[in-house]
Amino acid sequence: MAPEINTKLTVPVHSATGGEKRAYVTFLAGTGDYVKGVVGLAKGLRKAKSKYPLVVAVLPDVPEDHRKQLVDQGCVVKEIEPVYPPENQTEFAMAYYVINYSKLRIWEFVEYNKMIYLDGDIQVFDNIDHLFDLPNGQFYAVMDCFCEKTWSHSPQYKIGYCQQCPDKVTWPEAKLGPKPPLYFNAGMFVYEPNLSTYHNLLETVKIVPPTLFAEQDFLNMYFKDIYKPIPPVYNLVLAMLWRHPENIELDQVKVVHYCAAGAKPWRFTGEEENMDREDIKMLVKKWWDIYNDESLDYKNVVIGDSHKKQQTLQQFIEALSEAGALQYVKAPSAA
């Protein structure tokens, strides 16, 4: 039978209180053009009227001008050190996957009670702040699809089995053993930063042999006992549009993951397989509409000299503080 996933997620209706701090977080490495994706994500969250900031975990090789672009878009930029798996002969499904182990550093961000991780090639088209209200103690993410060629190494792909339609092909337990546990796409997940978890993740990654999908496989292994699936509207992997269209209502999708080959909007040519589809071109256009919308650029509050303006500014700061959106950075001493 198919796993039970409510198509409409029900969460408690309440706001963060009692000093609870929440934030979105993404990851950026290198000098390439992925910074465009993160800028687009920051603007998308702003258009969706999210109450919470976007933290960008950057590796030391991210250049200063890219960091400035992110700060100018209201992001909280936090430098992290790389995390590498044990040396091995594994060929990752994509060569750049190896650097993604550095995402494990985000469990160290304990100044926040709860965070939602989003890859830099994701866009948020509707408010998802309610996901912060999901019960604590679980790891929430959207199930992945096994039907693309990048999964050709797996027994699932070889027998035509996919957890998105588990009744279509019966898992042959007699031949392959127990059915694999549910497997999530690690481009989006809801989690709780925790130093104990953080240190254990780093210790565990030292002894677990790397696999083709790098940190995604690792996180699936590590959190398999507390993983709770959430509906695909919170992380639409584009392959779902041609592999499992019966599972997708495109007008209900809140988060789109441009992870298919050729799908990155800032590199899009439409020449790769499936990229000439009208729904794909529409989603790429929607991304560009947000990226190019100057009204969505972050705007600093200008301090005026009147008492009234100062009162308004103070109210604005208090509102941001309550929402967990204000970051205080100590200035260096002039002494």
UniProtKB/Swiss-Prot annotation:
Induction: Induced by abscisic acid (ABA), drought and high-salinity stresses. Promoted by methylviologen (MV), a superoxide radical generating drug, a superoxide radical generating drug. Its main location: cytoplasm. It is found in: Cytoplasm. SUPFAM superfamilies: Nucleotide-diphospho-sugar transferases. It holds the Pfam family Glyco_transf_8. Gene3D superfamilies: Spore Coat Polysaccharide Biosynthesis Protein SpsA, Chain A. It catalyses: myo-inositol + UDP-alpha-D-galactose = alpha-D-galactosyl-(1->3)-1D-myo-inositol + UDP + H(+). It is an enzyme of class 2 (transferase). GO terms for molecular function: inositol 3-alpha-galactosyltransferase activity; metal ion binding. One of its GO terms (biological process) is response to water deprivation. Its EC number is 2.4.1.123. Its cofactor is a divalent metal cation. InterPro entries: Glyco_trans_8 (IPR002495), GNT1/Glycosyltrans_8 (IPR050587), Nucleotide-diphossugar_trans (IPR029044). One of its GO terms (cellular component) is cytoplasm. Accumulates in mature seeds. Mn(2+) binds at residues 119, 121, 257. Keywords: Carbohydrate metabolism, Cytoplasm, Galactose metabolism, Glycosyltransferase, Manganese, Metal-binding, Transferase. It comes from the Eukaryota. The active site is at 103. Belongs to the glycosyltransferase 8 family. Galactosyltransferase subfamily. Galactinol synthase involved in the biosynthesis of raffinose family oligosaccharides (RFOs) that function as osmoprotectants. Promotes stress tolerance of factors such as drought, chilling, salinity and methylviologen (MV), a superoxide radical generating drug, by mediating an increase in levels of the endogenous osmoprotective compounds, galactinol and raffinose. This is Galactinol synthase 2. It comes from Arabidopsis thaliana (Mouse-ear cress). The lineage of its organism: Eukaryota, Viridiplantae, Streptophyta, Embryophyta, Tracheophyta.
